[in-house]
């Protein structure tokens, strides 16, 4: 098979499996936000992803379905399958045998993390497609040294940045390769200038963001009124404080997690071929090694220093994983060629089929989202709990963007006014009020919340913070909290929670989905506690922690509830679990200090407070 036919075959096979396991609706985290931005040509979270917004909208127009989320999920699967096809084509172009190239591409297609992102609305498939194209074009430009190849490479590099900022992590390897292989490249001023202009030309698609910002009914993350705001959006300024913020111990912990992740992405029997392939690439295809090895090094340098919820960290290693998949193909090919010295390897096709089958079987169940309606049902349950003409203020990623999607795109409960507490999508502030200093914005939002409370409309919150009015309190009402004047009868108006969605089993539920299910149990505990059933409430809180056992926020919130109910040892266990999940957050240590102080263990309390202080 030629490189093109191998790539096409890989794409078709990957896409077929993705369609079988495709999520039928909105999913967790940023899925709802991205769908709302694509369908309404809005401006999603930094860095904006204009290429996905435009191409995803085009695909949704072409598709004949009347299920908006499903169409954008298909777009995600299409680009992911194309990335796998590009990987097979690249390997074939580098001399890897067709069956081995096809196998390596499918092994990556069915790797744990990439598959999970291919079947929901996400940008990573398209981003990695551009990564493969840039690697292929850099190799061609360095070998043929045609000016038009260099210009096309520059354009692809710029375009890749509009898909995901990870693209910049392969740039150092590209520059090193061009300077190394293209003699006098740096001295060709005209070519260098034209190449830079080509990069700018590819990147010019970001003009979509200020042109569309605030227009139409799509999701808009934030106003982009000027050049500074645009730069902050494009560069991901919101996330900068999370980079290079970890101590050495944190970097080592992330390195350990990356290594464990790599062990689980492909079958354990294939792991030696990953690193053997790197060695073979170094010996036989130095150009390919420079690009892939440089990308892996840059990816690890950035991601190992990145502090975020550990459950969300694996996607930040996808660049390193696709480069390791390239090494896997090179190593697998070398193994087959060595065995071929003893005669024609008749076992090649069965061996390739077995390798793909092992990885496919290992990851199918946990990657299958075809029956996963939990996120959508949670959003619908939240909206169903609201009385007519209510106001709901949301925050966080668990449900905020699911609710935004349901109301913005599917028009569920249009009588409800939905606001995001920090201004993502639907904001209490007017568009021009985002020019105010952050502290003034916070005060203004609080004032608006108070005005809503006094207006007489039922005001509900997803997460209770500090009440905007004195003499008012948050009262659990079903899955939400209602803000109302302090009541003398706490049992009045209790709402029965429908728990069916919390008990869905028989399908794989990742950490984010289980966090949603745990919210049912946590709110059941809140309602029972309000009704005076402390024993039942404690049992419900414990069940919430059992369901979302790897969620730092759930374990911490349960610990806090146990502490307030004087269940100190149980509170300590959950606080310790929260600290183990993310050792670089101060709140669990501060809570543990309060627990120890209440137990009279003041020495331990002082040490824990010191630890909390160091992390703030």
State each model region's role.
Residues 264-286:
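Hydrophobic, aromatic-rich transmembrane alpha-helices
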Residues 92-95, 118, 134-152, 157-159, ...:
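Membrane-interface transmembrane helices that cradle and orient dolichyl/undecaprenyl
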Residues 8, 74-95, 133-137, 326-330:
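Transmembrane-helix motifs of polytopic, lipid-linked glycan transferases
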Residues 4-7, 12, 87-110, 129, ...:
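Transmembrane-helix signature of polytopic, membrane-embedded enzymes
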Residues 380-391, 398-404, 410-616:
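C-terminal luminal/periplasmic domains and tails of membrane-associated envelope-modifying transferases
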Residues 20, 41, 62-69, 73, ...:
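Aromatic- and kink-enriched transmembrane "portal" helix at the membrane-lumen/periplasm boundary
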Residues 142-143, 170-200:
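Perimembrane helix-loop-helix junctions
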Residues 282-285, 330-361:
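Signature aromatic-anchored transmembrane alpha helix within multi-pass, membrane-resident enzymes
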């Amino acid at each position: 098979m030629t490189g093109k036919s191998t790539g096409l075959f890989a794409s078709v096979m990957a896409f077929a499996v993705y369609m079988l396991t495709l999520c039928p609706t909105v999913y967790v985290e940023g899925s709802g936000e991205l769908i709302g931005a694509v369908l309404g040509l809005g401006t999603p979270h930094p860095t904006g992803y204009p290429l996905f917004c435009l191409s995803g909208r085009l695909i949704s127009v072409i598709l004949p379905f009347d299920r908006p989320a499903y169409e954008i999920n298909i777009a995600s699967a299409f680009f992911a399958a194309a990335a796998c096809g590009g990987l097979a084509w690249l390997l074939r172009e580098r001399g890897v045998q067709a069956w081995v190239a096809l196998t390596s591409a499918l092994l990556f297609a069915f790797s744990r993390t990439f598959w999970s992102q291919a079947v929901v609305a996400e940008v990573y498939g398209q981003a990695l497609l551009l990564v493969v194209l840039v690697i292929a074009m850099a190799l061609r430009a360095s070998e043929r040294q045609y000016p038009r190849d260099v210009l096309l490479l520059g354009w692809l590099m710029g375009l890749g940045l509009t898909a995901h900022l990870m693209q910049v992590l392969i740039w150092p390897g590209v520059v090193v390769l061009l300077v190394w292989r293209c003699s006098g490249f740096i001295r060709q001023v005209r070519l260098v200038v034209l190449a830079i202009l080509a990069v700018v030309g590819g990147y010019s698609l970001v003009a979509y963001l200020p042109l569309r910002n605030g227009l139409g009914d799509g999701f808009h993350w934030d106003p982009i009124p000027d050049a500074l705001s645009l730069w902050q959006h494009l560069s991901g300024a919101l996330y900068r404080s999370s980079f290079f913020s970890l101590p050495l111990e944190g970097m080592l912990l992330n390195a350990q997690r990356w290594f464990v992740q790599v062990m689980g992405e492909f079958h354990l029997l294939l792991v030696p071929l990953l690193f053997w392939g790197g060695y073979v690439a170094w010996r036989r295809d130095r150009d390919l090694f420079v690009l892939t090895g440089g990308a892996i090094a840059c990816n690890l340098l950035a991601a190992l220093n990145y502090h975020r919820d550990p459950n969300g960290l694996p996607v930040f290693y996808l660049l390193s994983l696709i480069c390791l998949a390239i090494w896997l193909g090179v190593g697998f090919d070398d193994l087959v060629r060595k065995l071929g010295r003893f005669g024609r390897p008749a076992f090649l096709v069965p061996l390739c089929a077995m390798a793909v089958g092992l990885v496919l079987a290992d990851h199918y169940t946990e990657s299958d989202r075809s029956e996963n309606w939990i996120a959508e049902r949670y959003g619908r349950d939240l909206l169903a709990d609201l009385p007519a003409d209510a106001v709901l203020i949301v925050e966080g990623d668990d449900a905020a963007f699911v609710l935004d999607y349901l109301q913005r795109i599917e028009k569920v409960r249009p009588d409800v006014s939905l606001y995001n507490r920090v201004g993502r999508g639907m904001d209490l502030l007017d568009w021009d009020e985002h020019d105010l200093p952050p502290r003034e914005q916070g005060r203004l939002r609080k004032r608006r919340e108070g005005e809503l409370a006094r207006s007489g409309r039922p005001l509900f919150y997803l997460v209770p913070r500090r009440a905007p009015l004195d003499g008012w309190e948050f009262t659990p009402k079903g899955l939400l909290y209602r803000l109302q004047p302090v009541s003398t009868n706490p049992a009045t108006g209790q709402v029965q929670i429908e728990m069916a969605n919390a008990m869905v089993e028989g399908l794989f539920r990742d950490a984010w989905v289980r966090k949603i299910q745990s919210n049912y149990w946590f709110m059941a505990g809140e309602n029972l506690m309000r009704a005076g059933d402390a024993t039942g409430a404690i049992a419900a809180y414990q069940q919430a922690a059992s369901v979302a056992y790897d969620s730092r926020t759930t374990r911490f919130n349960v610990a806090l509830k146990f502490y307030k109910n004087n269940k100190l040892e149980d509170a300590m266990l959950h606080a310790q679990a929260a600290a183990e999940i993310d050792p670089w957050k101060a709140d669990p240590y501060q809570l543990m200090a309060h627990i120890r102080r209440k137990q009279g263990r003041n020495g331990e309390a002082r040490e824990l407070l010191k630890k909390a202080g160091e992390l703030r």
